[in-house]
Amino acid sequence: MKFHPTRPFGLYFEFFIIISFFFTSESTGDVESFMKYSNVAFSEGLAGFDSLAHVYQALLKKSTCYQEVAATLISKCSLLNTELTIDNRIHSAIQMTLCDFERSQILAPSECVRGSQSECVSKLESTSTWWLSFTSHFHDVNHLCRLANLEMQKELSIEVNMNVTLVQKQFLEMVILHLRNFESVTDKMNQRIDKFDGKFNSVIENSFKDINFRVNQEIMGLVELQNHQQEGMVQQKEILSTIKQLKSEIFDINSFFANFIEESAGYSNSLIEKLNEKFTSENAIALSAIGKYTSEFSAFMEKRIKNLITTTEDSLQQSVQSNIDFVNSGFQPLYDLTIQLKEELQSLKRLSSEQQNLQHEQILQWKSDFLNVSKDHLKVLQQLRPLIDIVEKFMNVYFKGLSNIISSFAFIGFTLFATLSSLFFKVLKIHRRPIIVFGSLSIIFIHIYCFKITSWVNLYGWITCTIARTLSFIKLNIRTFYLTAFLCALLNFLRYLKYRNSKKDTELSLFLPAPEECNIYHNEHIQVQEDNYLCPIENSLIDLFGSENNKEKLGKQENVRFAFLNSESLEQSPWWD
């Protein structure tokens, strides 16, 4: 492809910017960090996904054509839920290449507009810049699809976490509601217990008052009975003392009436015996009456105490049983609810653990995929380094040539400024000597600058500028000044045309095709069949299109088109050397 004069230089620069944007973005730093540290942490490795997001955002910020292609690509990825097929990737890459044509205001090939997909690929392969744009988009299609899938997985994880949070919120609200019900039931139970305590205390107090009253009455009766018994004993003692007195009197009478006592001894003995029997029977009757009264009182008191204890036990047992039934009726729903909540918590915990395991496995899979993609990017970047060096060299030479041309026009501007100054002073009728001094200084300065940019061109330019400077110093006038400026500008322009019309094509020097032989370690020659470069797969420096099966499905050996951009394949001399 020849360098056409009307074709803008910005087109080649634009294609270079497109390539460098996708392969030298912020992910370059991440790739170098992967090479420097083999065991990189996963938190640092996830930063590479930001680079893919930047690529996706860059496509969205472009024209409507890029946005439509990106939207179609994302919809296909979401429907397939897997990696795109080769046909889909080629179709998307062709559409993005057409967007590049539209953006650069280049007429798209008819094969890509109305022809088949294979014809379009063949047409793009015929031009190196078109093919470079197509291959760069072909690589980025699968990355954008993975980015879309990651966004879908992210939204799904967020939705699952929101559902779990909602379940936890509902569970907490239910627990709070049941706790409030439990508090109300507990308050009612406390009120009933307080009321029961008051009634129980009043019943116990009244019962003890009645018992104390009855016990006091019985004690008073016992005291009175004891008093009567003591009075009987006193009377018995008095009777005994009286009997003693009678005995003494009888003894006196017997002593006085000894004879009479002997006679009446029998009568007296019988009388004493009768009296003893009488007093003994009376004492036995009194003691039996006291024992009978005491046993009856003890039985009555024991019966009353048993009745009181039985009544108290029955009332207490009924009250306690009613309270127990009331408490059981209040706690049974709460117990059932607690069992149900425990089962729900166990199921929720099991579901959460399963979800965490799934997320962990998915993150590990993403990590391995990202490492593989990063390695592929690193290989591509390593092979593009010689191309970047060539482009940098090319840009430096072109900018230097443009600087020389601009310097020539600046030289002409200085000349026009001196001419206008001379005319201005002439119109104002100022003395001519300042004009000569100003013109001399300007010519000296411009000659020095002209010598700087033309002295190293060639011998012819050096001799011409030397003659022009000599004439300028001999005759300081405007004509020689114009001659010097014109010659310097002409030399710079001729130098540009010399390299512009050189035999070696500029574009082919910049984007070098594959050489006629594979520059591998043993310099094994290859066979050339229908303009295809067939190199052994195991000796290729890089495989830009993935597995070996993909190579058989693509166009004319795309997989080795840029496989030999190494230091040995760049031995062809470009035009600037």
Swiss-Prot record:
Coiled coil region boundaries: none
InterPro entries xref list: Nuclear_fusion_Kar5
Top-rank taxon, per record: Eukaryota
One family name in Pfam for this protein: Tht1
Triggers of expression: During conjugation.
PTM annotation, UniProt: N-glycosylated.
Name by which UniProt lists this protein: Nuclear fusion protein tht1
Keywords: Endoplasmic reticulum, Glycoprotein, Karyogamy, Membrane, Nucleus, Signal, Transmembrane, Transmembrane helix
Residues in the signal sequence: 1-29
